[in-house]
Regions:
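C-terminal motif of bacterial Sec signal peptides marking the signal peptidase cleavage site
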Residues: 4-7
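Bacterial signal peptide processing site
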Residues: 9-11
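A cross-domain feature marking catalytic cores of carbohydrate-active enzymes
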Residues: 48-52, 90-94, 130-136
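A short acidic, helix-capping loop that chelates divalent metal ions and anchors anionic groups
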Residues: 57-58, 97-101, 138-139
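An active-site-proximal structural segment forming one wall of the substrate-binding cleft
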Residues: 28, 68-88, 102-134, 138-172
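N-terminal carbohydrate-binding accessory modules
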Residues: 16-87
Length: 172
């Protein structure tokens, strides 16, 4: 899974508490840090965009079927893999799924759905790329991630807190 930054974990539930887990973690971290952008790009291969689904919204409310597409299924992801794709980009809008300051907590049900879709992708041995998509469009109701608005300190705080939650959720 790729977010804004590349990361990987060994999947151990011991949180690195034993020597083997620490060795596994070091090996995985070493493998990722030794890859340059060209190598990563080659490894990820041809990608497919799962657009107009998790970034679809109406009146500032994200909903994967609001633009007329069906619910994302694992069968869809399997069909994508069968066509030879190795990577799936999953654009996601958060908009009103983000709570108020100071925590800006993302709605757990929405994050669970994003997780489910990411799990379809990763579970089929594909790379997943997720982003924040549409939250900065001037044409999208309730967009908040706009670089020319006067409240830049608030926007930066919200951006950092939202990405921290996404990164924490998908770190493994």
């Amino acid at each position: 899974l790729m977010l804004g930054l590349t990361g990987c974990a060994n999947g151990s539930d011991t949180n690195g508490s034993d020597a083997q887990s620490q060795a596994d973690t070091a090996e995985v971290q070493s493998a990722w840090t030794e890859l340059d952008q060209t190598t990563i790009t080659k490894e990820m291969g041809m990608g497919w965009n799962l657009g107009n689904q998790l970034e679809a919204s109406n009146a500032g409310i994200p909903s994967e079927t609001t633009w007329g597409n069906p619910i994302i299924s694992e069968d869809l992801i399997k069909a994508v893999k069968e066509q030879g794709f190795k990577t799936v980009r999953i654009p996601v809008s958060y908009l009103d799924k983000i709570g108020a300051a100071p925590d800006y907590t993302i709605d757990s049900a929405w994050l669970d759905r994003v997780q489910e879709v990411v799990d379809y992708v990763v579970g089929n041995d594909l790379y997943a790329i997720i982003n924040i998509h549409g939250d900065g469009y001037y044409t999208v109701d309730k967009s908040w991630l706009r670089c020319v608005d006067d409240n830049q300190d608030e926007i930066k705080d919200k951006y950092e807190k939202v990405w921290a939650q996404i990164a924490d959720r998908f770190k493994d």
